[in-house]
Every structure is written in structure tokens, then in C-alpha cells.
């Protein structure tokens, strides 16, 4: 895999002490039933990696190793297109607005009123200008976005749900159907990604290398 994913100039810094030190994303287990990798089985909602920390990841590479006969696809949604599709009123109203992001590693969607004292969480701008493209993206995702700051709970929930519909509109989503040997890379600051479910009796394994990020504001 390492020979296939040599970093081009300006691509950023891979996380981990070695470029070959990549995360195995799989639901496979060893003979004793212990997990061999991370991010196990099943559907995973749209998200941007580590949106709930101060410096979200910049990008990622995924390399297909073991692919189920159906499902286990990776979807990508354009945050530029999502921003373009927002009502003009919202672009003005929320131009300086922040969204609180949090995540529960048990895969549970956190409640807007959840106690975050022992959870990873961070506030990110709703709109973000990508320094490479100069384009504005809508940095909001179903998996991690908890609440819109300075809004009442019910209005925040309502607007977030409407935003999720915009970011997940099939017109701006690409769905990658994996084959062994596929190598996919993406900009974590300009698109969201998600994972579809697959049969429980089948395995799925991919290698991931992540590019370290920075602050969005």
C-alpha cells in the first residue's frame, strides 16, 4: 500500500511517526474475537473527520483490501455545493455563526444538551473558506453537529435537520463502490463522507492514512 500512496509535494503531513503506519478500518476479528482494526461494522453517517477537535484532519487516503459483495460503499458530499444550495437568507444570517461539534465513540448521536465535560467537542464556523480553493463550504455534518450557537434548542434542531437534508441531497453526493486495490483520497475540509451498511456475515477491510489538519478559524 505504501508504494501506492507516496505523498506528493504540498500534500500535508501524514499523521503517525511513519508514512506506512496506517489505520486498518475493519470489522474483522482475530481467533479470540478481538477487533483487528477500528470503526467496525455498519452504516456511518455523514461527517468530516475530527470536526469535534481544534484542528480537524486535512484529508485522508483509503485503500480497499477486503470488500463485501454488497454495501460498504463510501459516499462523498460537496460542502461547496451544499453552501451554494443554501437559502440566501441563511448565508447572510449565519455568516458569523458557530456550530458545536461532539462525538460519542459508541456511535451515539449526542443530544444538544449533553454534558460535554468528558466528551471531545469543539465549536467550528458554520461557513468556512477553504484556503486552497478560496471557496466557501458549509461545515456541518449529521454525525457530529450538536447545536447552532445563539439559537434556542428547537430552532437549532430544526435548522440543523434542514441543513442535513441539503448536505445529503443525492444531487451533490458521489457514492464510491469499492473494489480491492482502489485508492481514494479526499479533502476533509471541502467534503463530507459516509459509509453504507453491508451484510453482517461478510467482512470489510481498508487501510487509511490521514493528513494532519489545522484550525478553521
Task: Describe each region flagged by the PLM.
Residues 1-185, 189-217:
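Fe(II)/2-oxoglutarate oxygenase catalytic core
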